[in-house]
């Protein structure tokens, strides 16, 4: 895509937006229903595309992507009328007599750039919010998941209003051509490195952004818990969650020296229960997305500070781009595997003398997108929530805060900015416009020249909401 082509796409959408077409409730509903049809009429095609890109199991394709998009569409359709209604607010003495409300206004023409790890979900989920809010949208799917990208382009062109919603496929040149345009908002999901490029491009036009990035998400495992349940839940979003290629996947575990051997045994047992003795042959595990990421992952294992810390797994199959679930015990904190986001099927376990030492370790790294704690101790839960700064926290499970549409999902610090899901998606793509209405009555002479001391006292009382002070000023009493 050339600069001219990108300008043409944006100009066309800008004309559609100015026409007011996308602002109506009816248009928004029609487009949300179109997205819903894609999930119900073309689910098998989506499964096949995800299998082609990631060897994603059918179960994960439905649970982690198709059902999530379907539920987000249904929720938006159910709640949209309420979301669009102006929000009444009380007014103060300073504006009496008046009424006031907050009106949700679409931003205009927005750009959604998506990631490859959940290429169907991460494309359509933010789009649902953008459409519900009444915007025109350009979707740039990830070229690293080409089958899903091509399918999205085909289905969206078939189902949605292409005068208001466009798909632009391609790689770096196409993305840069898009970033050079003036947008009313950019929503990006992906790596921090590319996030910096997006933010820099947006700054040229003072364009607001939502950045959904990542980080090293810690999982703290306390003693005296049900280790079998904890192990199963950790596995469910580490290895059963796209082979660890998930931004909120557990990146490393912190537990006590005494608890570590028992935890390792519990995870080993459940891994073999899920994937058998030879997990590389299991059809229930996704592959690594491409050879570059595969080499990065095996390179982490080849680090001298890591290679002798493998207590389970470590095998790989380059021909199928698969790496077995791998547990690393007591790796050095200055090792490569503890210095960067893993984003794969390797799970380091850090041991400490006391569980409270976890806070120092977590605080030594950039703020993560998510953090997890397994414990039966209510006080420890309160301490964890208070002491750990993260995009979101789940206690005694993994990633479930992501599934709750009434919770905002987003990062903090280097793990991202802004949030979405449910009404938070609608709000992310809306401007909250303040509207105050008055009649021609209720004139206050103290507002206007010529100024006098009593007028100053009168205005002070009004602005402070001081009825007694107002009366004193009216009667000319000095304070």
From Swiss-Prot:
The keyword Plastid applies. The keyword Transferase does not apply. Coiled coil: none annotated. The record marks 117 as: Transition state stabilizer. GO terms for molecular function: aldehyde dehydrogenase (NAD+) activity. GO terms for cellular component: amyloplast; chloroplast. Keywords: Amyloplast, Chloroplast, NAD, Oxidoreductase, Plastid, Stress response. Induction: By abscisic acid (ABA) and dehydration. Oxidizes nonanal, propionaldehyde and acetaldehyde in vitro, in the following decreasing order of reactivity: nonanal, propionaldehyde, acetaldehyde. It comes from Craterostigma plantagineum. It is found in: Plastid, Amyloplast; Plastid, Chloroplast. This is Aldehyde dehydrogenase. One of its GO terms (biological process) is aldehyde metabolic process. It is an enzyme of class 1 (oxidoreductase). Its EC number is 1.2.1.3. Belongs to the aldehyde dehydrogenase family. It catalyses: an aldehyde + NAD(+) + H2O = a carboxylate + NADH + 2 H(+). The active site is at 212 (proton acceptor), 247 (nucleophile). SUPFAM superfamilies: ALDH-like. NAD(+) binds at residues 190-195.
């Amino acid at each position: 895509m050339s600069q001219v082509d990108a300008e043409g796409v944006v100009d066309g959408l800008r004309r559609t937006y100015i026409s007011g077409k996308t602002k109506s409730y009816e248009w928004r509903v029609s487009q949300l229903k179109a997205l819903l049809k894609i999930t119900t009429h073309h689910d098998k095609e989506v499964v096949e595309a995800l299998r082609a890109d990631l060897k994603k199991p059918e179960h994960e394709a439905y649970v982690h992507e198709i059902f999530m998009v379907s539920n987000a569409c249904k929720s938006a359709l159910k709640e949209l009328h309420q979301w669009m209604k102006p929000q009444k607010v009380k007014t103060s003495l300073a504006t009496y007599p008046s009424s006031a409300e907050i009106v949700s206004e679409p931003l205009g023409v927005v750009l959604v750039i998506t990631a490859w790890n959940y290429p169907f979900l991460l494309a359509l989920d933010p789009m649902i919010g953008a459409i519900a809010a009444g915007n025109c949208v350009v979707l740039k799917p990830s070229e690293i998941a080409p089958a899903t990208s091509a399918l999205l382009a085909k289905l969206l062109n078939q189902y949605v209003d292409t005068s208001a919603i466009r798909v632009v496929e391609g790689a770096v040149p196409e993305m840069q051509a898009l970033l050079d345009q003036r947008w009313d908002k950019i929503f990006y999901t992906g790596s921090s490195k590319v996030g910096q490029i997006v933010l820099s491009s947006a700054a040229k036009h003072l364009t607001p952004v939502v950045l959904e990035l990542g980080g090293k998400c810690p999982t703290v495992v306390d003693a005296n818990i049900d280790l079998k349940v904890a192990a199963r839940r950790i596995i469910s979003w580490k290895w059963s969650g796209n082979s660890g290629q998930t931004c909120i996947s557990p990146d490393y575990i912190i537990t006590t020296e005494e608890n570590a051997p028992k935890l390792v045994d519990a995870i080993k047992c459940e891994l073999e229960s899920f994937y058998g003795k030879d997990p590389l042959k299991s059809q229930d595990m996704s592959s690594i997305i491409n050879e570059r990421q595969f080499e990065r992952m095996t390179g982490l294992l080849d680090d001298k500070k890591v290679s002798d810390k493998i207590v389970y797994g470590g095998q790989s199959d380059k021909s199928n781009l698969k790496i077995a679930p791998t547990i690393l015990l007591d790796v050095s904190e200055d090792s490569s595997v503890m210095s960067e986001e893993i984003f794969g099927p390797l799970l380091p376990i850090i041991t400490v003398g006391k569980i409270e030492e976890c806070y120092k370790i977590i605080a030594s790294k950039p703020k993560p997108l998510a953090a997890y704690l397994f414990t039966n101790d209510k006080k420890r839960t309160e301490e964890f929530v208070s002491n750990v700064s993260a995009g979101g926290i789940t206690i005694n499970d993994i990633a479930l805060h992501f599934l709750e549409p009434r919770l905002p999902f987003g990062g903090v610090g280097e793990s991202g900015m802004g949030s979405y899901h449910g009404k938070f998606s609608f709000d992310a793509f809306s401007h909250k416009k303040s509207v105050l209405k008055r009649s021609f009555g209720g004139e206050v002479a103290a507002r206007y020249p010529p100024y006098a001391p009593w007028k100053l006292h009168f205005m002070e009382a009004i602005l402070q909401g001081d009825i007694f002070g107002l009366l004193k000023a009216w009667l000319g009493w000095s304070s």
